UniProtKB/Swiss-Prot annotation:
GO terms for cellular component: endosome; Golgi apparatus; Golgi medial cisterna; Golgi membrane; nucleus; trans-Golgi network. Keywords: Golgi apparatus, Membrane, Methyltransferase, Transferase, Transmembrane, Transmembrane helix. This is Arabinogalactan O-methyltransferase 1. PANTHER family: OS11G0490100 PROTEIN (PTHR31444). Binds to the translation initiation factors TIF3E1. It is found in: Golgi apparatus membrane. Disruption phenotype: Strong reduction of methylation of glucuronic acid in several oligosaccharide chains of plant cell wall components. The double mutant agm1 and agm2 results in the absence of methylation on arabinogalactan glucoronic acid side chains. One of its GO terms (biological process) is protein methylation. It comes from Arabidopsis thaliana. InterPro entries: IRX15/GXM/AGM, SAM-dependent_MTases_sf.
């Protein structure tokens, strides 16, 4: 027999689940580190001093504690559901501390930052009023207000025109200062370009009305950064709202179905290898996939 949960109690349950998720992440990280340290202590003469140093490393970061309190006491919950969040969370558990780039500030920002303890989590937000509100309430978040060159109503023309602009081609693609490629994100803070990102979450900018920036440039630029990766391993790209035509079309054009490794609800997860891992790259080919 199904039991309906009263609507006024749903936010309490969701908040507790999220607080548990953050707390679980903290416990998981501490357990793994403690296990590693125990093995090490058994084989070293300086066990005591290293144990003291390790204990400090196990302590929860302020942002983790803030997240637990926030989601346990608030009726404001993230945009993504638990199944969608869990996909990114499972990768963060493996890679943290990592370099994590998130397009958009929102009700989930505190959660994402807390799930990447001692890593770099950077948020990019195009709505100035919303940026000011979120950063005022959570001044410890690392965030930049940014501007985009595109509009959602240009999506189809951008998808056609990039195929005739060599600066957009995968063999020659770059972002900083690439004014000729309209899909390249330019004019952003140096931190965006200078950091090699391990994970990218594309859940912004707005893409539900004609004059909105749309996510075309964010998706294209995520693909470029992943292909230009210098460090070992793949770049994980998470794209939300794939139920919408533009998100789905641009994902299949630039992130590639062959690199999609997981999905839940409205979220797709791609694991994209560096372009150097490909045997041959045709400098005159516009295709990413």
């Amino acid at each position: 027999m199904n039991t309906l949960i009263p609507s006024e109690k749903r936010w309490i349950i969701t908040g507790v689940l999220l607080a548990g998720l953050v707390g679980g992440a903290l416990l998981f990280t501490s357990f793994i580190r403690a296990a590693d340290e125990t093995l090490f202590l058994c084989s070293t003469a300086s066990a005591k001093s290293r144990a003291v140093a390790a204990a400090a490393d196990y302590e929860a970061t302020p942002i983790q504690l803030q997240a637990i309190v926030h989601y346990a006491t608030s009726n404001v919950v993230p945009q993504q559901n638990l199944a969608e969040i869990s996909i990114s969370f499972n990768i963060l558990k493996k890679l943290a501390p990592a370099n994590f780039l998130v397009f958009g500030l929102g009700r989930d920002s505190l959660m994402w930052a807390s799930l990447n303890p001692r890593g770099k989590t950077l948020f990019l937000e195009e709505d100035l009023e919303w940026f000011q509100k979120v950063t005022k309430d959570s001044p410890f978040l690392r965030a930049h207000h940014v501007r985009y060159r595109t509009q959602l109503q240009q999506a189809d023309s951008l998808l056609r025109s990039y195929k005739t602009e060599p600066k957009c081609f995968p063999a020659k693609s770059y972002l900083r200062g690439n004014e000729k490629c309209k899909l390249a994100l330019t004019g952003l803070p140096d931190e965006f370009y200078d950091t090699e990102w391990d994970l990218l979450m594309v859940d912004a900018p707005k893409g539900y009305f004609a004059e909105a920036p749309g996510r075309m440039a964010a998706i294209f630029s995520a693909a470029v950064m992943a292909r230009n990766r210098k460090k070992p391993g793949v770049t994980h790209v998470f794209l939300h709202d794939v139920n919408r035509r533009v998100e789905k079309t641009f994902a299949e054009e630039f992130l590639c179905r062959k690199y999609r490794v997981n999905a839940a609800g409205r979220l797709w997860h791609f694991a994209i290898p560096p372009a150097a891992a490909n045997a041959t790259i045709d400098s005159g080919d516009y295709r990413f996939c």
